[in-house]
Amino acid sequence: MEFKTLLLILCLVQYTISEVPKNIFIAGDSTADGNGANNGKTNGWGKYLGDYITATVHNHAVSGQSARTFYRDGAWAKLIKEVGKGDYVFIQFGHNDVGGPNSNPKGAAGGTGDETVTVTVNGVEEVVHTFPWYIRYFANQVLEKGATPLVLSLTPNFSWVDGKIPEPSRFAGFMKLVSDELNIPFIDHYNYIARNWEILGEGTLREKNWFPTDYKHTSPEAADFNAKMVISGIKCQKIEDLVAILNDKAGTVNYPCFESPL
C-alpha cells in the first residue's frame, strides 16, 4: 500500500513538472522589445520578464510593429514556428495601430469582426483586416499548437491629467473582447501600470527619468517595473500555469491588485 502511494505521488510530481510551461513567447512592439534603443536610454519590458520566471523567454517583439505589420511582414510566422505544446505566447499591440489602413500603413480596418479593406502599399495590394481579427488569428494559431495565448492591453503613455493616467485607447478593449470570445487569459497591463504609477506619483516618475526620450518609451528601470506589472497580473489573477514558474525574485514583487474596468 505504501509503495503504491509513493508511486502515485511520484507520477503526479512527474506529471506536474512536465506540465509546467517551459517557454514564453512575446509578440509586440517597442514597449516590449528587449533590444534597447537610444544608446541604452530606453528598453522594453520583455527584456526583464525572464528575471522573474523559470521558463525561457523568447522575445519576438519588434520596435514599430502593429498587429497588422507583425502579421504581414512575417514576424508572426517566424514566432509561431517555434511554439510547442504547453508553451505560452504573450500578445500585446496597440501603440502603432492607430489610423485607418488608407492613412497609415500600420493601421487596421475599422470594426471588430471580419471586415476588410483592400489597399496598395508600396505598389503591393494588401487585404487589411480589423485589429481584433489579427489578435484572433494569432491566438487561434497558438491554440492549434496546443499552447496558450495570453493577451495584454497596451502600456500607458506618460500622460497625466490632474494626477491621474487617462483611460486607454480602444485597443485595450479589443484585447479584452478577444479574450472573452476565445476564453483565453487577459492581463490588463495598462491598468496595473497606470494605477501603480498613480500611487508613486508623477513627480517620482519624473525624478527617476522613466521616460528619457519621449512619452512612450521607457528607461530600463521603468521597463523592469512594467515587467513586474506582468508578474503582478499573474499573481493577482492566479493564472496557475504561470504562478508555477515564478522564481524567488518574483516573490519580492508585491504591488496592489486592481480589477480591470474593461
Roles of regions detected by a PLM:
Residues 17-62, 77-89, 105-112:
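Serine-esterase "nucleophile elbow" of acetyl-processing enzymes
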Residues 246-262:
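A short, charged, Gly/Pro-tolerant segment at domain boundaries
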Residues 28, 44, 61-64, 94, ...:
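Glycine-centered flexibility sites
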Residues 78-220, 224, 228-247:
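Alpha-helical cap/lid subdomain in secreted, periplasmic
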Residues 36-40, 70-72, 161-166:
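Short, solvent-exposed loop/turn segments at secondary-structure boundaries
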Residues 1-18:
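Fungal secretory targeting signals
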Residues 30, 63-65, 155, 192:
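Short, solvent-exposed coil/turn elements at secondary-structure transition points
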Residues 67-78:
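N-terminal post-signal-peptidase region of extra-cytosolic proteins
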